[in-house]
């Protein structure tokens, strides 16, 4: 949990499947490599590495449950039949003044808002037809499953005032530039 006087900031990246969260975060990670003000969190997931999926650490269900029980996660949640966790070490990064960036589920936004006084929620979105096309190109779901997934999507801005939305329907370069601009703004405010 974050101290009362935070030095860094937690940036929670959310958005629907197919919006391009990993693509934008990967590009930002490359652009910011070597800049110690920024730390991209590597998620821990109960799934083995597969081509075409995000780079993550894997734990089986039993080891994940044990790690959660031992308090080794800053946050953890369940989605799409898998369990996801963020390592507790991210709190040390924030305490040290870093802008910590993590891909999270909207289900944990209330926990993030409760635990981290210095935070930003970045919603990566795209038009529905763009999402459908991207999900279809992955080849992991049927047309019906994609339609059901898109029907479940809801808005992410709940009026709390900490949300920035980036529309990634077009060129990913423009979306990445907007994301980097936001991260640099946070870093300037954090250091000031």
Swiss-Prot record:
One GO CC term, this protein: cytosol
SMART domains on file: GuKc
Keyword Nucleotide-binding: yes
Keywords: ATP-binding, Nucleotide-binding, Transferase
Binding-site residues for ATP, renumbered to this chain: 15-22
Pathway of action: Metabolic intermediate biosynthesis; 5-phospho-alpha-D-ribose 1-diphosphate biosynthesis; 5-phospho-alpha-D-ribose 1-diphosphate from D-ribose 5-phosphate (route II): step 3/3
Matches recorded under SUPFAM superfamilies: P-loop containing nucleoside triphosphate hydrolases
The name this protein goes by in its record: Ribose 1,5-bisphosphate phosphokinase PhnN
EC number(s) reported in the record: 2.7.4.23
Family annotation (Gene3D superfamilies): P-loop containing nucleotide triphosphate hydrolases
Gene, per the UniProt record: phnN
Lineage: Bacteria, Pseudomonadati, Pseudomonadota, Alphaproteobacteria, Hyphomicrobiales
Coiled-coil segments on the chain, per record: none
């Amino acid at each position: 949990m974050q101290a009362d006087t935070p030095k860094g900031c937690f940036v929670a990246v959310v958005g629907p499947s197919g919006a391009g969260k990993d693509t934008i975060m990967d590009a930002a990670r490359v652009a910011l490599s070597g800049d110690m003000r920024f730390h991209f969190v590597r998620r821990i997931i109960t799934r083995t590495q597969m081509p075409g999926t995000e780079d993550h650490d894997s734990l089986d269900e039993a080891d994940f449950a044990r790690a959660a029980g031992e308090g080794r996660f800053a946050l953890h949640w369940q989605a799409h039949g898998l369990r996801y966790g963020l390592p507790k070490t991210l709190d040390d990064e924030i305490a040290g003044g870093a802008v910590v960036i993590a891909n999270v589920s909207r289900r944990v936004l209330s926990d993030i808002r409760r635990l981290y006084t210095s935070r930003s929620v970045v919603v990566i979105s795209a038009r529905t037809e763009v999402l459908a096309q991207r999900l279809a190109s992955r080849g992991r779901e049927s047309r019906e499953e994609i339609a059901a997934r898109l029907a479940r999507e809801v808005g992410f801005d709940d009026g709390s005032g900490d949300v920035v939305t980036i529309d990634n329907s077009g060129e990913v370069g423009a979306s990445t530039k907007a994301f980097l601009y936001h991260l640099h703004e946070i870093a300037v405010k954090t250091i000031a």
